[in-house]
Amino acid sequence: MKLFNSFSNKHYDIVHWYPRITVIDSKFAWNTDQHMDHEFYGDFGSFNVEITLPNHYVADGTGTLLNEQEVLPDTLRKKLDINNFIKKPYNSPPSVITKKDGTKKTWKFSAINVHDFAFTADPTYRIGETNWDGVRCIALVQEPHCAGWVNCSKYIAKVLEINSYNIGPYHHPKMIVADAQDGMEYPMLTLCGGFDPEYRSLLIHEMTHNWFQGMIGSNENYRAFMDEGFTQFYTADTYQYIDGPLMIEQKPKSNYVEKFTEPVRVLDDQIYNSFYANAVIRNEELPLNTHSDDFNGGIRHGGGYGQVYTKTAAMLKNLEYVLGRSFFDKAMQHYFKQWKFCHPYPEDFRNSIIGFTGVDLNWFFDQWLETTKTVDYKIGRIKHKKNDVYEITFKRKGSMQMPIDFVVIDKNDSARHYYIPNTWFEKPTGATTLPRWIGWGPKLKPTYTATLNIGTKIKNVIIDPSYRLADVDMTNNIKHGRINVRFDSHVYNPLNWKKYDVRIRPSVWYNGFDGAKFGAVMSGDYLLTKHVFEAGLWLSSGLGQAYLDSTVKINSFNKVSFFIDYKTSLNRYIKKSNVYLQLKSLDGLDAGTIGFEKRSNNNKTRVYTHLKAMLRDMPQDMVYLINDQEWGYRKLNSAIHVGLEHNYKYKRGVGTVLINLRSSAFTNDYDFSAATISSVNKNDLGKININTRLFGQIGFGNNLPSESMLYTAGANNEDLMDSKYNRSMGILPPNWGNYGNVTNHFTAGGGLNLRGFSGYLLAQKNADGSFNYNYKGATGAAFNTEIEFGELFKFMNPKFMKNSVKIQPYIFGDAGIINTNPAGTANVMSDLMVDAGVGTTLSIVRWGNLYNIKPLTIRFDVPFFINRLPYAENDYFQFRWMLGINKSF
């Protein structure tokens, strides 16, 4: 049962009856599988149901309403008609049609040849109805939403018409679509939500279940793809028949967003975008012929369960590609006619299709259902022979074989279509059929050369111009025009799986030495996976320089600065792995990184190794730093890192453990190594969040780079280089980052994170009268905690902010120790250092309609208490303040 409140009315969806009668079928006899939070498997039968409800409720459900005139007389039905409410403002409070008087009504239903019964009830339901071919098409809409559901009953009729034509006749007397804040299917009843036109794909999907889950009765507990995947295919197919090839969406309110929002193909939105996300981005492929409970250990829809929707839909689209549309339609209609009300299994489906077509399609079903093979074809060399004869070479890089449709575009933009069969079957086509290409995998006949007499020069060659072939790398399916270059508008558009996507935008930045910097940032990728890069180039103007010492030559700043980040997938060789590279000459720092990473199959664990090198080799390079005393001048800081990062979830919380081993390499300037471990946990306890961080490091070496040492109060200079706000002075005054005999005002999360000691040298007098300064070291441990309480006070985040700006106050406490001995000697640890206080963050988490812009967090901490007083302070408890950008951890 699902229950929710709407405008002080209780809404009921009574569904998923359990326990239920066990199904006996031809495969398993008595089917006794446990229910694992997926759909049920039920047998066909007849249901006679009586439901008694308070008098003011409006209800409907599976089957024929036997006493309609009793519970819904004509006078009441007219009052409930949706047309009476379509001019009401959307989401305005409902009226009262029937007053609650303490009496009850009994609704009587009879349903024949169904495997389940469900009903829905709500006092605010209003009714729209259309009739199609004797079938009642009923829309049950909550009155506040009527303005968004005006066309619902007519849309139901269209879906019934198209599905009955393409799949097979609908065998029940009615179809209900209910406004129920859901997306679920039951015989003759679908629970949906949203509004037109956004709800159209949802309505089609849930209604289409009535063919595959409803009338065919596939065992979704066993093989979910036979229902969800087939339904997903026809969701896209039916949508196109009704509304055309592009998704119908509401016009954006912003002219800027409208200008840069690209139209979306129905096939992409409903099938291919998600298919490529699974197959290429997340690399979560499993064979479709997998038990429904084997995805993510049977827990809901994770662990690649989405493949039963989109990989199956892509399989059927590729079966259409293999057979041709007309032949495919007839085969699917035969399957429905043969197996309706009969509980088929995967072998029944493939035998039905093969038997009807008379075509050996075992190679197709074996690849798509039983393996994780992928399609990947490439256009190779195009060789111009004499007399306008061309040789075009194709290469099969993937392990799945398919027939090939391709088009040749000549210099006059005329198109010539060709078809290369991959078996003895040849589909009906208007294209020129070439000799068949029979091969297997990437090694048995992996190349094919087509010899074509074009009669003129070739301009381009494109594999599958219909974009149906589920090729996992479309960038090599076209000879010219593989790259799509566009303005980086930061307006959301789905990923472009057809071409390599490049975005360019202007960029302006600032620091106190370069002044204003003007340049551009370019980024690009194929599905966020292959050849992912971001590069920036700026010219420094010197305009607005600030905080410069009189000894600094104001025009000695670096005139040009740049960075390049690059990463690409190595999935072809090692699953879920990447190689990455970074080069930069930015704000006085020349640095480079090259590394390798590998993620676990569930993406929770990442192991990595990389070599990182840094150098500041000019006097002016030191001017950029917030603290210019904490970096080795003209010293190469080069180190190898090996690490492991693990993310986990638990009840009411999430956590991350990071282990990093580091050792100097390829440098004579430093000798150091360190082992670091940190554990961060964020616990959501309702209106209070408790965040904790446990940190430890052991360091070794005789010559340690100051910029990479462990700092008591926060991040070291090396870590500051990862933030554009902190890598240079100017955004914040440089004197805030200096160390002295009092605390200071700059804070950045990292190190031991004892924020109350920011800027304090932590001097400790030795027996011989000398001093040690404990603000940095090589070995230490700390515990940090923050208790956030902003959700207790609604005024902290008022509605007008629309979740764009978030204010989060908290209480914090930090405790830690650090080594006090000189480098290369036995570790001697400091006394425990403690701070405590209050703080708040102001985070801009959404930038209006702009997409994919990182949040900005400004942090203000007031450590009222520290247990080691600076020389110039007298009270452990007093007002101190620190300002930083980004959270402490």
Report residues per predicted region.
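Glycine/proline-rich low-complexity spacer/linker segments in large multi-domain proteins
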Residues: M1-F47, E68, Y467-N496
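Hydrophobic helix-coil surface modules that form long, contiguous segments used
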Residues: P19-A29, D37-I204, F233, P245
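Outer-envelope beta-barrel architecture signal
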Residues: Y500-I504, A516-F518, T529-F533, N558-V560, ...
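C-terminal outer-membrane beta-barrel translocator/porin domains of Gram-negative envelope proteins
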Residues: P506-V508, L548-V552, N578-G595, Y608-H610, ...
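Surface-exposed extracellular loop regions of Gram-negative outer-membrane beta-barrel proteins
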Residues: V521, V532-E534, S556, F562-D565, ...
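Outer-membrane beta-barrel "beta-signal"
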Residues: G837-V838, F877-F889
